[in-house]
């Protein structure tokens, strides 16, 4: 099995860090392939914005994230950090999100990963069929 672990904690020696390390050790011990994205270590940009989209915009007068994500996925003009994470996700058969609960939810850096990487046109499409998205053939 190919696993992607997205880890979101600023302290590697934390309980969350230990849980991530144990997951890596356990999965590799069974012969699984494991890839880890450490959002804090890579200083992942957590804010969606116009700089996520290169090339001609769908609407240069108004920033619609959904429209720009769709266009950028169709034209291959997403920011390189997003594309790199999408490639990791496309290779994975299982996704593990390792994070602490802060203020009743995930850390902002992980929410930013979800917002930017699970882009419209990549992880889902606007119609109900879900037949066009890369991840349409498997549940997320």
How would you name each of these model-derived features?
Residues 94, 139-140:
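Conserved catalytic-site loops of classical short-chain dehydrogenases/reductases
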Residues 132-138:
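Short, conserved loop/helix-junction motifs that constitute active-site signature segments
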Residues 1-99, 104-122:
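N-terminal beta1-alpha1-beta2 submodule of the flavodoxin-like/Rossmannoid cofactor-binding fold
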Residues 125-129:
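A gly/proline- and charged-residue-enriched helix-loop-helix capping module
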